[in-house]
């Protein structure tokens, strides 16, 4: 784009960016394709959208409308101006329950809309697997449908009216009640009527899902409704700014039948036999997808429910029923009757009936994560989306699957077959290594032959994902000249200058299925450094883990723990996907300065990553941004030298030791404004942040005095009188030097349980601060000393941790540093809360707690949640008689160790914290707040008037005399 073109677009007042960072972020979507745009616009309203699109058109710059960028076929990328509607255009308004309608900005996410509608007893019917990030604009543009198409149909059927932006900048509202674009409508009606016979020939009945062909078949039946033309047009006719939508009542009840099969073909045959039961959905998942759930915390409950480890199978049909009778009783009876009929059908190896909503949600969580689970496969060969959207009639599925296998088996290819069996649509993903010429040849061969196979069945090569780049070249053979020419004329009516998404749907030679592939396929990534970390969980390689990011956008959500900076800001660069893309861009030298380790783009991506580890659990492909970040920082510091600030933060344990030699002086200096101002200027530690205070007495010194004191009370178990045995209490930096009261509370609880406690002598810092700063050699040296120290002692003694980030260092990151015997030590490491809860589960009366009514709210540490289900914390708190506990639905607190202390990160840190703060402020004032992480407690104390406790304090305070506060009495 020339400077003159940029100026013309800038003058509209719209937020438009032409910088390299933004262009690289928007060069990809969830497909295998990559096209670098000239710029990206973020319109705040329809007027701005019209102005910027008009300016681009006048400047001769093509426009690609974009939502969340979850397209699997390249719909949302282009070489001109990307107009992104998901950042600002997220308003929901004009809810009319009587009419059953609502108006939404097209940037509204499906889950956001359904959360808004649920209290009113309504939902938006079409339910796509990407509901946590898919925008309504994208769903309309693709005519999405999802699993429950048998009862809800496609998105087009739920559109009442659309507010659209034309290529000349006009903003028009279209729909059957609106008179706008009357001339255009008449021209299109004339075109479509002439093609009626050809449509009947090309599209015989029975096909439940198919690419709409600009919806001309639907428009033929409703010629006064141009929304039928726009729904499914993939941003090639106009940009959609807002939509009035039909909404549906929530079902009164649901039930689910699971049928397990020995083969995919048997499951497809059974699908045909089950359709008479009128299910809301019949979804298929196969063994390649199910195998990818192994070892993943977020899917373990689902694996247990499905009994996958004890009763393996090749294929599962998920058959869901809705009950919508006039009364709840009748609705329940309707579901029960159909579940009984399903149970009686002689299909499958075994069946399982579910009516518990929580259990059904577990099953859906596996199905919805299908794409990312499959692409999380280890190695360069991945299940690739390119023939994934072809649909046939459900009765044709068995023969269609055999046809696909006859294409792939001679080529030696495996594939996964999962998806919407009730609608005749399987998301078939052949396993290919697109880095190599041989598999690229097979890629082309499979695509060509599948297109021919779909024609034989008179099916649809695309059903709900669109045409995009991947299928444009096949449209003429799929539709024929007459229908394609009708569509081309409709394109000219709306977009005579071919401004919107040019080259897609109508081939001009620029878009082939094997063109515009991501650069890491055509030019495999190479590292300019020797990796230090093992990437031990799965991939065993930096590049392997980086390439696990398929762009699906699972990190672009507002729930769970991934990705907290995206939740706070909505910026693409703040997401796991954005960061992975920028790392890849840096390695491909697509950054300013062409330095793969140091650039503005890389700093923007990595410096705001909190290393919360949320992506390691919630990204089904297990992208580990925390490891990727620290590996890159290490390579940079090894080349350029470790900066002073990173050196200081790497040595917090040493600073604690020094500060505790003169705590009064050290604490006084923390509030001395000139000193704090100097610290901010020299090393960037914010003068406005409180810093951890130093203890008057170190915990380890208190503990020595405690051991030397005579036994007081009945619960003290040192001096060789252990009832249960020996435990090592890991006194981390903050317990030792800053928060000894937490260690004292833990001692009281452990001794009340009858344990003999010791502290590790000559222990070093766990290495977490150094690891987080990319100072990996220092972290490894500390790790080796700690492992050697602990390995030299008794090999079965549990090591109990109070700080989750220290615990995660031992159980995960020591292995990443390739420390000998790290696995052995990791097996002995346990969080204090888990240790106590496990014991009380076996012996509920082991601790004499008082009985008093109280509310407890728990904010778990990110690292704990990335490894363990935090439900055990709620169980533990509720073991205290009279207590009612809840685990807060929160992500990272935003402090993230040193991150929140940095002057340039304070505002973002506080922004990230708002989810935690809002959750706490919504609680009754008397609620006790529990936070296991020292950073979490510090952040909450800084931003509120509340001072959270550690779980050890809650337990110690609840012990009945004489055991209560025994340790403190010996201080």
Q: Each predicted region: which residue ranges?
A:
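N-terminal flexible segment immediately upstream of the FAD-binding catalytic core
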Residues: 1-54, 58, 68-100, 129, ...
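Terminal amphipathic helices with adjacent charged low-complexity linkers/tails
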Residues: 243-245, 268-271, 275-381, 385, ...
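C-terminal substrate-binding/cap subdomain adjacent to the FAD-binding core in PCMH-type
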Residues: 139-141, 149-155, 159-366, 402, ...
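Flexible, glycine/charged-enriched surface loops at secondary-structure junctions
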Residues: 15-19, 66, 125-128, 196-213, ...
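Ferredoxin-type iron-sulfur electron-transfer modules and their immediate structural context
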Residues: 381, 456-461, 468-608, 627, ...
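A glycine-rich phosphate-binding loop feature that marks nucleotide/adenosyl-phosphate handling sites
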Residues: 71-74, 130-137, 208-215, 219, ...
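Iron-sulfur cluster-binding electron-transfer modules in prokaryotic oxidoreductases
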Residues: 495, 502, 626-971
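N-terminal glycine-rich flavin-associated loop
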Residues: 8, 31-63, 81, 85-128, ...
């Amino acid at each position: 784009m020339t400077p003159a073109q940029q100026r013309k677009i800038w003058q509209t007042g719209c937020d438009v960016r032409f910088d390299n960072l933004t262009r690289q972020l928007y060069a990809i979507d969830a497909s295998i394709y990559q096209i670098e745009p000239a710029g990206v616009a973020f319109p705040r309203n329809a007027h701005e959208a019209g102005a910027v699109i008009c300016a681009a058109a006048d400047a001769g710059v093509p426009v690609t409308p974009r939502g969340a960028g979850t397209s699997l076929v390249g719909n949302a990328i282009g070489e001109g101006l990307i107009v992104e509607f998901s950042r600002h255009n997220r308003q929901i308004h004009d809810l009319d329950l009587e009419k059953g309608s609502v108006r939404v900005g097209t940037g509204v996410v499906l889950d956001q809309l359904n959360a808004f509608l649920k209290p009113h007893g309504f939902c938006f019917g079409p339910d796509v697997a990407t509901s946590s990030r898919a925008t309504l604009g994208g769903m309309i543009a693709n005519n999405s449908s999802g699993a429950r198409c048998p009862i809800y149909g496609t998105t087009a059927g739920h559109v009442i009216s659309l507010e659209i932006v034309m290529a000349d900048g006009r903003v028009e509202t279209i729909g059957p009640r609106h008179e706008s674009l009357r001339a255009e409508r008449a021209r299109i009606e004339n075109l479509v009527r002439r093609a009626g016979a050809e449509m009947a020939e090309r599209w015989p009945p029975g096909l439940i899902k198919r690419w709409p062909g600009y919806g001309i078949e639907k428009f033929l039946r409703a010629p006064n409704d141009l929304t039928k033309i726009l729904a499914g047009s993939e941003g090639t006719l106009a940009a959609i700014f807002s939509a009035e939508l039909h909404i549906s009542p929530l079902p009164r009840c649901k039930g689910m039948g699971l049928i397990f099969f020995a083969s995919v073909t048997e499951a497809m045959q059974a699908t045909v036999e089950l359709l008479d039961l009128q299910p809301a959905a019949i979804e298929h998942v196969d063994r390649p997808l199910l195998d990818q759930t192994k070892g993943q915390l977020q899917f373990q409950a689902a694996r247990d429910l499905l009994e996958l480890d004890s009763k393996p199978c090749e294929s599962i049909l998920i058959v869901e029923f809705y009950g919508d009778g006039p009364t709840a009783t009748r609705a329940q009876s309707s579901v029960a009757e159909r579940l009984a009929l399903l149970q009686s059908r002689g299909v499958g190896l075994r069946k399982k009936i579910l009516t518990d909503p929580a259990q059904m949600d577990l099953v859906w969580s596996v199905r919805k994560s299908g794409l990312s689970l499959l692409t999380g496969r280890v190695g360069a060969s991945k299940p690739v989306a390119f023939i994934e959207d072809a649909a046939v009639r459900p009765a044709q599925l068995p023969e269609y699957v055999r046809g696909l296998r006859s294409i792939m088996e001679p080529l030696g290819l495996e594939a996964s077959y999962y998806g919407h069996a009730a609608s005749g649509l399987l998301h078939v993903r052949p396993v290919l290594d697109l880095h190599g010429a041989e598999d690229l040849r097979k890629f082309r061969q499979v695509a060509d032959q599948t297109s021919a196979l779909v024609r034989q069945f008179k099916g649809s090569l695309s059903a709900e994902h669109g045409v995009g780049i991947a299928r444009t070249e096949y449209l003429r053979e799929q539709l024929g000249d007459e229908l394609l020419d009708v569509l081309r004329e409709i394109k000219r009516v709306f977009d005579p200058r071919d401004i919107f998404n040019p080259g897609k749907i109508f081939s001009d030679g620029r878009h082939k299925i094997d063109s515009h592939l991501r650069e890491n396929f055509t030019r495999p990534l190479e590292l300019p450094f020797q990796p230090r970390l093992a990437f031990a969980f799965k991939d065993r390689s930096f590049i392997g883990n980086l390439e696990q990011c398929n762009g699906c956008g699972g990190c672009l959500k507002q729930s769970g723990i991934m990705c907290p900076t995206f939740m706070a800001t909505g910026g693409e660069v703040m997401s796991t996907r954005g960061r992975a893309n920028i790392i890849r861009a840096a390695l491909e030298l697509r950054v300013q300065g062409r330095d793969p380790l140091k650039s503005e783009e890389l700093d923007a991506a990595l410096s705001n990553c909190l290393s919360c580890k949320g992506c390691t659990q919630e990204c089904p492909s297990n992208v580990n941004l925390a490891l990727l970040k620290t590996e890159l920082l290490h390579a940079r510091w090894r080349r350029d030298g470790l900066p002073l600030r990173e050196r200081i933060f790497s040595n917090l344990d040493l600073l604690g030791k020094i500060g505790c030699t003169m705590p009064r002086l050290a604490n006084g200096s923390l509030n001395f404004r000139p000193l704090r101002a100097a610290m901010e200027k020299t090393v960037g530690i914010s003068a406005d942040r409180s810093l951890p205070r130093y203890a008057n007495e170190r915990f380890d010194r208190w503990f020595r005095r405690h051991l030397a004191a005579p036994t007081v009370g009945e619960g003290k178990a040192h001096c060789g009188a252990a009832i249960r045995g020996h435990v090592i209490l890991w006194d981390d930096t903050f317990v030792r030097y800053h928060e000894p009261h937490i260690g004292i509370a833990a001692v009281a609880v452990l001794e009340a349980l009858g344990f003999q406690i010791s502290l590790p002598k000559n222990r070093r810092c766990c290495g977490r601060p150094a690891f987080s700063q990319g100072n990996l050699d220092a972290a490894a040296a500390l790790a080796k000393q700690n492992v050697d120290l602990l390995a030299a002692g008794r090999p079965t003694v549990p090591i109990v941790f109070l700080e989750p980030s220290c615990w995660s260092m031992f159980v995960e990151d020591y292995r990443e540093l390739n420390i000998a015997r790290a696995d052995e030590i990791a097996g002995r490491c346990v969080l204090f809360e888990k240790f106590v809860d496990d014991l009380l589960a076996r012996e509920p009366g082991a601790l004499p707690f008082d009985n008093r009514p109280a509310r407890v709210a728990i904010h778990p540490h990110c690292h704990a949640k990335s490894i363990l289900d935090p439900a055990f914390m709620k169980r533990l708190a509720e073991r205290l008689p009279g207590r009612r506990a809840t685990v807060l639905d929160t992500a990272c607190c935003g402090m993230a160790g040193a991150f929140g202390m940095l002057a340039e990160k304070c505002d973002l840190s506080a922004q990230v914290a708002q989810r935690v703060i809002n959750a706490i402020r919504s609680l009754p004032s008397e609620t006790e707040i529990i936070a296991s992480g020292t950073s979490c407690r510090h952040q909450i104390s800084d931003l509120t008037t509340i001072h959270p406790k550690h779980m050890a304090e809650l337990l110690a305070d609840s012990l009945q005399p004489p055991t209560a506060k025994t340790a403190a009495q010996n201080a």
